[in-house]
């Protein structure tokens, strides 16, 4: 292994820079040249590929986002388009590609490894949604979780001041982990997630029971993959008449300096990705399972169901929110 490349793809997440840094420095430590692909798979097509040095990743571990930039590239699903990308790697003698991103990013990496045996590919899970099989946690999840906690804590201050119910929408796509973990952490009265059937009347009854016991305000935390906060508000109004407001947290959840947990995870996964390439491994995603760094084939990741919603945590949150 003489030359490798690294790119970030899909939605950005805090800790991506730390992962790139780990890839670059582990490779250079092992006398491997490293190239950065700017703007994700689009950069592969546009030949936006540049050599990275030790200094290229200096002062990046604490930065959110990705200095390599990211972009959606739906045309990468077409084989003729991928041929251009593969040729741009081959002409530089690049033998390994590390892809940091989510499920779609992994699928692009798998296609490259299938269509060009000369290029090994390894995926690193970078997304705030925590929705990738083969790992307990994705890079960016912990930072986004802490961002949500900070925001909801502030919203609770104003909710209590005005005796209001706030319906707050968190990101997560089709995975309820962010809403679940944040909801437990902030003491939300109700958590609405895609993994659990939503009964709006039950939510209304719970809020009403709280009011009867003297509660002055409530927090309803909604995962975007289940319903919008506005829809939740509209349906709730059919069963209960309380002063309420909607707050959609939005893209602020993707930003910010990564937490220590995300920096450590990104560093461990980035270093291990290079180790795997040096061992001749390909078409695998790295992850953390039971605090151990592991590698799982892309096929297993796409077919697997090992990243399960924690129903016991959901039940605990329900018990504690009475």
Curated annotation (Swiss-Prot):
Residues engaged in binding ADP: 21-25, 156, 187-189, 213, 215-217
| Binding positions (substrate) | 127-129, 164, 171-173, 224, 245, 251-254
Among the GO biological process terms of this entry, one is:
fructose 1,6-bisphosphate metabolic process
- Top enzyme class, one word, equals transferase
What are the record keywords, sorted?
Answer: Allosteric enzyme, ATP-binding, Cytoplasm, Glycolysis, Kinase, Magnesium, Metal-binding, Nucleotide-binding, Transferase
Active site residues of this protein: 129
Q: Which GO terms describe its cellular component?
A: 6-phosphofructokinase complex
Can you tell me which residues the record assigns to a coiled coil? none
InterPro entries on file: ATP_PFK, ATP_PFK_prok-type, PFKA_ATP_prok, Phosphofructokinase_CS, Phosphofructokinase_dom, PKF_sf
Q: Which Gene3D superfamilies match?
A: 3.40.50.450, Phosphofructokinase domain
- Entry binding sites for Mg(2+): 103
The residues that the entry says bind ATP are 11, 72-73, 102-105
What reaction gets catalysed by this protein? beta-D-fructose 6-phosphate + ATP = beta-D-fructose 1,6-bisphosphate + ADP + H(+)
User: EC number(s) of the enzyme?
Assistant: 2.7.1.11
- Bridged cysteine pairs (disulfide): none
User: Activity regulation per the record?
Assistant: Exists as both a dimer and a tetramer and the equilibrium between the active tetramer and inactive dimer is regulated by several allosteric effectors, including protein concentration, pH, ADP, ATP, AMP-PNP, and F6P. ADP, ATP, low pH, and AMP-PNP shift the equilibrium toward the dimer.
Q: Where in the cell is it found?
A: Cytoplasm
A GO molecular function held by the record: metal ion binding
What outcome is documented for mutating residue 164 to A in this protein?
Complete loss of fructose 6-phosphate binding
Q: Name one Pfam family in it.
A: PFK
| Pathway in which this enzyme or protein is active | Carbohydrate degradation; glycolysis; D-glyceraldehyde 3-phosphate and glycerone phosphate from D-glucose: step 3/4
Instruction: Outline what the protein does.
Output: Catalyzes the phosphorylation of D-fructose 6-phosphate to fructose 1,6-bisphosphate by ATP, the first committing step of glycolysis.
- Return the similarity comment: Belongs to the phosphofructokinase type A (PFKA) family. ATP-dependent PFK group I subfamily. Prokaryotic clade 'B1' sub-subfamily.
Q: Which HAMAP family match?
A: Phosphofructokinase_I_B1 (MF_00339)
Q: What's the subunit arrangement here?
A: Homotetramer. Homodimer, inactive form. Component of a possible RNA degradosome complex composed of cshA, eno, pfkA, pnp, rnjA, rnjB, rnpA and rny. Interacts specifically with RNA helicase CshA.
Q: What is this protein called?
A: ATP-dependent 6-phosphofructokinase
Organism field: Staphylococcus aureus (strain NCTC 8325 / PS 47)
